[in-house]
Amino acid sequence: MNSKLEQLKTMTTVVADTGDIDAIRHWRPEDATTNPSLLLKAAASEAYRPMLEKAVAHAAQHGGSDAEQLTVATDMLAVLAGKEILGLIPGVVSTEVDARLSFDTSATLERARRLVDFYDRQGVDTNRVLIKIASTWEGIRAAEQLEKEGIRCNLTLLFSFVQAVACAQAGVHLISPFVGRILDWHLASSGRDSYPAEEDPGVFSVSRIYNYYKANGFNTVVMGASFRNTGEIEMLAGCDRLTISPALLQDLKDDQGTLARKLNPETASSPDKPGQINEKQFRWESNEDAMATEKLADGIRRFAADQIELEHRVRQLAQAA
């Protein structure tokens, strides 16, 4: 009997949710995703030291104010990490735009284009890069324009159905609906200790989005993210992609049980009918969803805080040089 991880790979593209080079080398996933939190953690390892030094040197050559050099250095670090990861996987890597720009369409466009330019200058095929952007109204508008320019996007911090509808409407390449953080909110608000996997609110959210997309012919890829346990993963077997932490990958590898497919494009059906979402509707429906409003804001704050900490680490290295 194959492990549940091997069974999952026959129906879903497995993505490693880590910036740890050694973990990616070990797991050999199809794709990989990174974010400021993962980069901050990875940057503490010696494997990242040469990349940090190269990023700082590049920023110094770029010139500009200290603040500008910091953003250049952290962008270049993300690109160098992405380049290293792409040498270990056959698919794509996702690189995130600074979360502090989540409510600024033009600034998001500028930074996204710079990331792609940095990849291009490193000799990387930019078709293997997805630009991660928070699923705010402004972020979705930026992604819509980037997709028209041939820059494929991964819309992250997605917690609500209206965000998913708006992303599909904008022609976004891929979305990352979060599972575990939705569960976290419902556990805290309900006072419950747990939910069975088949009743998990995060699983329900991703399943609803997946079935809506497939039943209505949307091409946007659904990549479930932010898992708290393997039960959530098993309930989403068959989803286009699932991005999974190394610890949960190990749990799936160690499990020799049978894994049943739960999501299938051939049998997808949805009571939700496609419609056009305008800004007023998006903001109202987002406001009415307390969980999505709170988790989106919290996610942006967390990524922004880790971005600031990453810049602090880069500044220390630059001052020591």
UniProtKB/Swiss-Prot annotation:
Residue spans crossing the bilayer: none
Q: Does the keyword Transferase apply?
A: yes
Q: Which SUPFAM superfamilies did the record assign? A: Aldolase
Can you tell me which residues form the catalytic site? Answer: K132
- Which EC number applies? 2.2.1.2
Protein task: Transaldolase is important for the balance of metabolites in the pentose-phosphate pathway.
Q: Which family does it belong to?
A: Belongs to the transaldolase family. Type 1 subfamily.
State the name under which the record lists this protein. Transaldolase
